[in-house]
Amino acid sequence: MDCYTANWNPLGDSAFYRKYELYSMDWDLKEELRDCLVAAAPYGGPIALLRNPWRKEKAASVRPVLDIYSASGMPLASLLWKSGPVVSLGWSAEEELLCVQEDGAVLVYGLHGDFRRHFSMGNEVLQNRVLDARIFHTEFGSGVAILTGAHRFTLSANVGDLKLRRMPEVPGLQSAPSCWTVLCQDRVAHILLAVGPDLYLLDHAACSAVTPPGLAPGVSSFLQMAVSFTYRHLALFTDTGYIWMGTASLKEKLCEFNCNIRAPPKQMVWCSRPRSKERAVVVAWERRLMVVGDAPESIQFVLDEDSYLVPELDGVRIFSRSTHEFLHEVPAASEEIFKIASMAPGALLLEAQKEYEKESQKADEYLREIQELGQLTQAVQQCIEAAGHEHQPDMQKSLLRAASFGKCFLDRFPPDSFVHMCQDLRVLNAVRDYHIGIPLTYSQYKQLTIQVLLDRLVLRRLYPLAIQICEYLRLPEVQGVSRILAHWACYKVQQKDVSDEDVARAINQKLGDTPGVSYSDIAARAYGCGRTELAIKLLEYEPRSGEQVPLLLKMKRSKLALSKAIESGDTDLVFTVLLHLKNELNRGDFFMTLRNQPMALSLYRQFCKHQELETLKDLYNQDDNHQELGSFHIRASYAAEERIEGRVAALQTAADAFYKAKNEFAAKATEDQMRLLRLQRRLEDELGGQFLDLSLHDTVTTLILGGHNKRAEQLARDFRIPDKRLWWLKLTALADLEDWEELEKFSKSKKSPIGYLPFVEICMKQHNKYEAKKYASRVGPEQKVKALLLVGDVAQAADVAIEHRNEAELSLVLSHCTGATDGATADKIQRARAQAQKK
């Protein structure tokens, strides 16, 4: 363990800092880092280098090359820069490279050098040019702050939702500030800048002068400033060689350190660990690296090469042409276990496990000592926590073996923390591999979350590793494997050197019916890449027609979209396509398309019946559908025409259509309707009252009710109403009028073609038994019993039934007998039945 702590450096009495190598860089740089614009993304992100050809000592004719590497120096992309001079580079939270040009344009590139988009920082920036720029990160996203040639600041807090803010002017500012940075306080971005010995804070409304509390006297200029990773702390480097450290609000001083170097540093960044009370700043010059904090002494390292600092959540990454290192505060658990002469529970447990492997009795002694103090649970937890903060797998295994050894002597130690740590370390070791090049620490991994890490693997097109991690962690398919396969498929469709057929087959073989994968999304990506035929092939695998059809319409494959909509059976989907086709095609082509799709034609007719009647008529005309055309004119005659002449004309057109359709019945019926309308109009003129639009039967009934019997009979003859129907109409009308005398005359006018039982029924319906009895005697023998029962003459009905010897009539009469009044009648029927059975 003494050897293990050889690279530990104390800062004061309470903290140690260590620097270890992440990778040996093999990126074959042709330029020194000082001659390049450099940007490195946090959380073990990629590195972008752009050699600066716009420097005066360089040849202006040489075009710069933008190179993108992984953190291990593996090349990811290289492209010749063909745009304007670049002032600053920076990475967004989504690992998109933002290139801020001198003219205020910001070009956005993907991790593999693919151009994504561009935006401008405004006309004022374009006119005054860009002197300096900062890319910063907030809870809203990634922002850009610009210092223009007019010494004004413009910023946007979120490049994904660009809203430019012009900051207030600094009074009397005639030259560029000596240093400046972006602060994020209360969810608002501010600019802090130094002008000589003065500091100014710019917000959206005002410019205010601020003074750091407890600043050493004699400061005439601020040379460098740095804000911490979480924007909570601020460090200021003065021309006196003092480094002031305090809160970002400039209300509280943490400490001040005299580094005895007045030369401005190349970089200054914070180096702090989450939940740690220690605060330290790392300052870099050409060949010196210094770690300073709240201690009288500093930690100093010699830099053999030109280096670049990348602030992280829990430390600082330092890379040069040959190495990539990580500097951080030693975590508390590691310090407790590994510091010299430590008697911490975790240290004793680690020793006990090592002695156990040697089969030494000292293992039992160490273990008993921990158990006697009651600290075995604490020892296991310390070893588990320390394993997470170790970079070397061998040391991770040693600590986890110690934790596992200690767990064996605990009855109820929850295994979750141990299992999760093993899983997390396996994932971390996989992504830290040189060929992957994402040197995440455990703290960064937990802050980033597994979902974001998977997204970054997908962004690097490391699909197999991402899928293996999902399967190992047993993530739900929708969040894990399915999502990654969908990304893989979207990348696959961009490979234009492979045929559409092969790409579609490969995607289907890999994806199959994987839940959570949308073939329509993949097809949309293929269409966006200009591969329409591939998109159509992919849509064949999409089971949801509601996802197929919109994209087919977007691709101008409307007829195919119509076929798919019809196959789905979703009428709303069919209507959507039909309305799209109607706007896209001319009228003739639209109708021809409908003729080839009967279901679509039927649905469109239904639509037209409610919305576009004239279009419906055109459809019938084009199809020579005279039958439906006739029906259309009949409906139109009643719906649209109010004048009798117009209605008759529409009916005449309908009759002609029916004759063309060889439907003589409909044609004759239409002509009869025309005659009836003319007659009704004449009756209204001659008799008054309301006749128009009545049916033939209602017209006859109305005439009878009005006492115009002769006209009713003439109407019946003209329209050949059968006698039975006419008698029913007249019988009903006279009964409604309660004109019993006229009804009796009518019944005696000639023999009734409907018999006399209807007379009985109608009279009883009007509650007139007296009149009903008049007609009951005239009812024929076969209906006599029913008529007598209707008028309530049960006894006579029984006599008739006995006389007819009809079992059904006897049963009918018997059902009308009541015990109190018709007992004798019931006995009479029973005796008649008995006699009939004897015979």
Curated annotation (Swiss-Prot):
Keywords: Autophagy, Cytoplasmic vesicle, Disease variant, Dystonia, Endosome, Lysosome, Membrane, Nitration, Protein transport, Transport. The keyword Membrane applies. The modification 3'-nitrotyrosine is found at Y4. Gene3D superfamilies: Vps16, C-terminal region. Changing R725E: Disrupts interaction with VPS33A, no effect on interaction with VPS18 and impairs endosome-lysosome fusion. Ubiquitous. It is a peripheral membrane protein. GO terms for biological process: autophagosome maturation; endosomal transport; endosomal vesicle fusion; endosome to lysosome transport; intracellular protein transport; regulation of SNARE complex assembly; vacuole fusion, non-autophagic. Residues 642-736 are annotated as: Interaction with VPS33A. One of its GO terms (cellular component) is endosome. It comes from the Eukaryota. It is found in: Late endosome membrane; Lysosome membrane; Early endosome; Cytoplasmic vesicle, Clathrin-coated vesicle. Belongs to the VPS16 family. PANTHER family: VACUOLAR PROTEIN SORTING VPS16, VACUOLAR PROTEIN SORTING-ASSOCIATED PROTEIN 16 HOMOLOG. Core component of at least two putative endosomal tethering complexes, the homotypic fusion and vacuole protein sorting (HOPS) complex and the class C core vacuole/endosome tethering (CORVET) complex. Their common core is composed of the class C Vps proteins VPS11, VPS16, VPS18 and VPS33A, which in HOPS further associates with VPS39 and VPS41 and in CORVET with VPS8 and TGFBRAP1. Interacts with RAB5C. Interacts with STX17, MON1B. Associates with adapter protein complex 3 (AP-3) and clathrin:AP-3 complexes. This is Vacuolar protein sorting-associated protein 16 homolog. It comes from Homo sapiens.
